């Protein structure tokens, strides 16, 4: 199976410009290809990861990746299928975010070895000294307004209004393809399915200005079985930066993937062979309650993004938090992350309350009678250890990093005391 057929088998091809010619090129030659990343945040996210891993698959197949940071286009903002104008970022912010993109991409792509080592460039390099007159004469003249407004990404904004700044974005992206072709013989662009209009502007400019054929592959929008955009948890993006989304949070995200989506996501987000995934699917379907596919997803993706050690720590954290282990083995940050949905109650560090008083004060028990019953019946745990002394008073050893104590009532009801 060649790389193009594998991408299709994994559900990673939505549209292409000339499938036969592209498949032939990917089979016979080393193809230089690129993906553009506009620095619109200080971290890439799970949606970007699909494209990053597709870049890696192509590099592993012998093709040469170029990561294009949109230092110029990031100052403008892509209007594609957005309801309103993007907020314009300052040049300093875009420059700072561009540097973070590079450091994240280095985790996945090989920038050091071989003829097909990855390279990174910034479109600010060619837009910085391009005058407005030159842009209109040398680039703008190759696009008709009719062509530009026919793009679905622009049509969706015609009624609500679109500025000339964002209207011209597709030409800027098209010019990126032209410049990369002239500088590095790049002939293929990868992008999300919402980028089709902008990407084909590049193949059009390449055809008109250089009489060359460029190729485009769009990746489908990754959705779950209900049709919702995949990659968010409770409405929040899953970031690749560990400070924005911890490895534990990412681990839990994958563990909670719906059964109907798990095998599909294994094909998209892991480097397990299709044969291995088929075997996992067979075992998974035979015993869905064991959630094998989700466990493999969590292992593969967290290890890929954050490393094996971070994955193992996430597993340990999960086992201790939900398996009844000693929470003092964990740091306060991991506990707060893992129990972020649990009620919190702040008390003074020097407040000497008995356990009964503490249960009532924190709202864990509604009355002294109930508190006594819970303690006597062994339903109260401090940092994972059962406490049955009615007059127990918290000690310094109960205060993890002098920041918190976790009280659990029964099997699942956790409460976090903070100091």
UniProtKB/Swiss-Prot annotation:
MF term (GO), any: RNA binding
Catalytic activity as recorded in UniProt: tRNA(Tyr) + L-tyrosine + ATP = L-tyrosyl-tRNA(Tyr) + AMP + diphosphate + H(+)
Keyword set, alphabetical order: Aminoacyl-tRNA synthetase, ATP-binding, Cytoplasm, Ligase, Nucleotide-binding, Protein biosynthesis, RNA-binding
Residues engaged in binding ATP: 232
Gene Ontology cellular component terms for the protein in this record: cytosol
E.C. number(s) listed in UniProt: 6.1.1.1
Name of the protein this chain belongs to: Tyrosine--tRNA ligase
SUPFAM superfamilies assigned: Alpha-L RNA-binding motif, Nucleotidylyl transferase
Family statement drawn from the similarity comment of this UniProt entry: Belongs to the class-I aminoacyl-tRNA synthetase family. TyrS type 1 subfamily.
Function (record text): Catalyzes the attachment of tyrosine to tRNA(Tyr) in a two-step reaction: tyrosine is first activated by ATP to form Tyr-AMP and then transferred to the acceptor end of tRNA(Tyr).
Subunit details: Homodimer.
Enzymatic class: ligase
Cellular compartments annotated: Cytoplasm
Record motif 'KMSKS' region, residues: 229-233
'HIGH' region (motif): residue ranges: 39-48
UniProt: L-tyrosine binding residues: 34, 169, 173
Biological process (GO), any one: tyrosyl-tRNA aminoacylation
NCBIfam families reported in the protein's UniProt record: tyrS
HAMAP family attached to this UniProt entry: Tyr_tRNA_synth_type1
Ranges where the S4 RNA-binding domain occurs: 353-419
Pfam family for this entry, one: tRNA-synt_1b
